[in-house]
Structures are given as C-alpha cells and as structure tokens.
Amino acid sequence: PCASGRAAHMSGSAQHLRKLLTFFFQAHPWHGIAAEASHAGHYHTYVELTPFDGVKYEVDKATGHIRCDRPQKYSNLCPTLYGFIPRTYCGTAVGRHCAKQTGRESIHGDGDPIDICVLTEKPISNVGILVNAKPIGGLRMIDDHSADDKIIAVLEQDMAYGHINSIHELPIAMVDRLRQYFLTYKLSPDETNPPVEITHVYDAAEALQIIRYSQEDYHE
C-alpha cells in the first residue's frame, strides 16, 4: 500500500488500541480525557473539590489518582464544585492574555490545567468524578505574577442554573461569594493582605477564549 494508506492504517490501529486499553485501565483525568463534551461550548470537568470538603483534594499529576493535598486551613469552603478541564494547561498563551488585559508585564501561566467552578442545584459530594459544564464567565486571578484564571460554569441540564449563559445573570451575591473564597482561602486570621488578587470578572466569550488558549498551551 502507498505511504498515505499505511499512515491511515497505523492511525486507525492506534485509535483501536487506545479504545481497547480503556477497558483495562482508567484514563488519566488530565491527559486521557477530551476537553470538549458532546454539546458545543460545553466541557468535561474533573471534580477535585466539593462544597462539603474540609480537606483539599487534587489530582496527582504523575499517577492521575486523587490525593489529599492538605486540610483546609480555615473555615471557608468553596461554594461550588471545583476542578479542572482535561487537556488544558496554563502556559505562555494564557499568561500573555492576562498580561494584555491587565497591562502588566512578566505574567505567566501557573503551569496547571485551567481551573473551573461548576454551579449546581443538587448537592454533589463526591470528588474524582466527571461532569459536563457550560462556561458562563470567569474571574481573572493573579497569584504571585501567575495567571490563575477561575472559569465559572453551570452544570449541563441543571434545573436551576442550566439555562444561564452569562455570569451577569447570576445573583451578584454568588459572584461575591466566589471572589471572597478565592481571595481569603489562603489567609490566616491575622493576615489582612490577600496573597492573590482578582482584577476582572469576565463574560462567557472571554472564558471560552481563555480555555482555547489553555488548549493551545497544552498542545505546545
């Protein structure tokens, strides 16, 4: 067969092998799962933290297992599901966008997959699960010269939040709760200056653009 035919056959064989391996091994949540969900503009989210967790969990990058990162130091709890979008990475493109929007220099991505908060009506108390989420906006957060965006999304088909398409449709109190959590969850009671700052709240269009930048960074 011609070279193009052999290449197509090898590509098909590789896809078949990957499909077979999923029957025996769990896919790595960062690298082994597609970012996009079945509906356009919706994304898979791997949940690392719920509003019920007094312990911070995160994915071990080497193994893909969920691990205990640390107990939450203080009493504040994340008001939403919290996790990341697979096959994303906050690198050069994400950092450049943050620098452009803030007019600052020397901003770089934080070297992690893009973070995402998912609003739900029903309580979900399990970590290490996948949900489909629709981004509606985000918080531009900077942590020690690192772009650490927090995408805000709603659970797909959620009865209370699923119809929302813009962060500006949310009650302002919910946005304030998210801002307060991220500004204070690392603060001790004696500290007054947050180690992070939130410079902007942005809408769905920019959230989707930042996700695309994080996908570009992942594939570099």
Name these PLM-found stretches.
Residues 1-220:
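Hydrophobic N-terminal alpha-helices or hydrophobic patches in metabolic proteins across all domains
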